[in-house]
Amino acid sequence: MSIRKTGIVFQRFGKQFKVFVENQTLVAFAQKKLQWKRDFKLLVGDKVTLENGVIVAVEERKNTLVRPKVVNVDQVVIVQSLIEPKINWQQLFKLLIHFHAQNVARLVLVITKNDLEFEPAEKARLSELTSFGYQLFFTAPNADLPLTLFTELQNRFSVFMGQSGVGKSSLINRLDSQIHQAIQALSAHQFGKNTTTSTVMFPFQNGFICDTPGFNVIDFPNLKQLAAQHFVGFASLIGQCHFSNCTHQSEKGCFIVSAVTQKSYSLWLYESYLKLIN
């Protein structure tokens, strides 16, 4: 008699998959017909059906991230520092564009190393982002983590990602001491060394946390086209542009350019958009 169960893929190694099933961890193989499907690969976050320890079906995905390669994400937690390493706004905007385009419902920004001195203008820019619905938290090594951060993570599949050296793995360890991640100090050149080498998922407060490899530079396909639709704050404005394919530069009837002129949309954000696409 076959026994069918449902679970979530949380790690892949070779042709084997680790799957959370009823609060247990099972090691499973994918059925051959799944392996033979063209351009299909099981990914961390896939909701699967197992039959006698073999993955026989995969549920339709609600979203698919390119970097990291994770699916069915409820929210992304972008971990960033303002200094050591200095915040890279262009990289942050690229991430926000990608996640908006992939219909990630919630985006959370966690700023680490808040005990270090940094330019007040940088903090003001971050606060400006909260007006567009992003959740913002500040943390420091010797201070307790905000309780509201724990609340944000409950009952959700949260993917953590960030530039190398910002303290992403250290933050996860503080959230749950049982999630042990290797930590390395910043290199002499102020670039962090990746402490996470693969995408891994952990149970956390009735949800999951997914740690991902750090990065120094990251790019996504079709970024310019996606930016015109998904840049910060554009969603409520682009429908009022005269042309549906408006790139928000010099086109006649661009509502975003008009909003910048009338100071109802941030000049700093608009200039950041132009820098990104040009």
UniProtKB/Swiss-Prot annotation:
Pfam families: RsgA_GTPase. Its EC number is 3.6.1.-. Keywords: Cytoplasm, GTP-binding, Hydrolase, Metal-binding, Nucleotide-binding, Ribosome biogenesis, RNA-binding, rRNA-binding, Zinc. It is an enzyme of class 3 (hydrolase). Gene3D superfamilies: P-loop containing nucleotide triphosphate hydrolases, Probable gtpase engc, domain 3. GO terms for biological process: ribosomal small subunit biogenesis. It comes from the Bacteria. Binds 1 zinc ion per subunit. GTP binds at residues 112-115, 162-170. Zn(2+) binds at residues 241, 246, 248, 254. One of its GO terms (molecular function) is GTPase activity. Disulfide bonds: none annotated. Monomer. Associates with 30S ribosomal subunit, binds 16S rRNA. One of several proteins that assist in the late maturation steps of the functional core of the 30S ribosomal subunit. Helps release RbfA from mature subunits. May play a role in the assembly of ribosomal proteins into the subunit. Circularly permuted GTPase that catalyzes slow GTP hydrolysis, GTPase activity is stimulated by the 30S ribosomal subunit. This is Small ribosomal subunit biogenesis GTPase RsgA. It comes from Mycoplasma pneumoniae (strain ATCC 29342 / M129 / Subtype 1). The gene is rsgA.
